[in-house]
A protein has these predicted regions:
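Short alpha-helical DNA-recognition segment
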Residues: 33-51
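Helix-turn-helix DNA-binding elements, focusing on the entry/boundary residues of the two helices
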Residues: 25, 36, 47, 62-65
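A short, Lys/Arg-rich alpha-helix, primarily the initiator
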Residues: 6-31
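Short, charged recognition helix plus adjacent turn
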Residues: 79-114
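Short, basic-rich loop-to-helix N-cap that marks the start of a DNA-contacting helix
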Residues: 56-70
Length: 114
């Protein structure tokens, strides 16, 4: 079996997440009773690329994944993946760095022109 370079250096949790995404896409397509050939045609990709997506292949561009999600009517949540509301670690770090007090900067002193 040939392994792509990206799957060799990719962290295990990321590989698992991509495989799960692929399975979820496959299951969503099946629930909608959309044959693979038609889903591929609607996404303007080959049937082979759709199979790769449904297996969670990391070599497929994220834009292609997004297009397939669009075909399935599921692209609306894609834009929220890294939104601040879904980032508890980032929100916690941001909260820890908030200043205790905010001071007004002194206005520059005017000098009299002679």
């Amino acid at each position: 079996m040939r392994t792509s370079r990206s799957s060799v250096v990719m962290p295990l949790p990321v590989r698992h997440a991509l495989r799960k995404l692929g399975r979820d896409i496959r299951d969503a397509r099946r629930r909608r009773r959309i044959p693979a050939a038609i889903a591929a045609q609607r996404a303007s990709i080959s049937r082979t690329t759709l199979v790769k997506i449904e297996k969670g292949d990391p070599g497929v561009a994220i834009g292609i994944y997004a297009t397939v999600l669009f075909v399935l009517g599921m692209a609306d949540r894609l834009g929220d993946l890294a939104a601040s509301k879904n980032d508890p670690v980032g929100l916690q770090l941001e909260e820890e760095n908030l200043p205790q007090r905010i001071r007004v900067a002194p206005s520059p002193k005017r000098t009299k022109d002679k």
